A protein has these predicted regions:
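Core catalytic lobe of class I
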Residues: 1-115
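Conserved SAM-binding loop
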Residues: 118-119
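Conserved phosphoryl-transfer catalytic core
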Residues: 123-124
């Protein structure tokens, strides 16, 4: 990301609300990258390093992030009309959050089955 001109702005840990199973982690890292000119819109919302947001799987896909958590990041790091790049699109939770918060998005997913799942999810909005 550094080579593309983006800096690591913030790193958080998301504590998932439910235990998926004993062989999987019940937390995930949240990495927020942006340009050097970035100014935080809500410093208070980002003071805690561990975030607690409910986890909801979608269509058997358990790796998706919480929509509330994604909205928290999008609304802090972008303005209405800006583009959000999601290089791990998954089932499209970030893209749905972008639509709901009036941001544009560019999603990348290498797994064809997961990508088609995301496209069908987005097509009903």
């Amino acid at each position: 990301m550094k080579d593309l001109g983006y800096d690591l702005l913030n790193e958080k840990i998301w504590k998932k609300s439910n235990e998926i199973n004993m062989y999987r982690y019940n937390y995930a890292f949240v990495l927020c990258f942006g340009s050097k000119n970035y100014k935080s819109k809500n410093v208070k919302a980002f003071q805690n390093d561990i975030w607690f947001h409910p986890h909801k799987s979608y269509n058997g896909y358990n790796n998706n992030f919480s929509k509330d958590m994604i909205l928290r990041c999008i609304e802090n790091y972008t303005d209405i009309g800006e583009i959000v790049l999601d290089i791990f699109m998954g089932v499209g939770t970030t893209e749905i959050s972008c639509i709901e918060s009036n941001r544009d998005y560019l999603g990348v997913e290498i797994n064809t089955e997961v990508y088609e799942n995301a496209i069908s999810r987005l097509s009903v909005l």
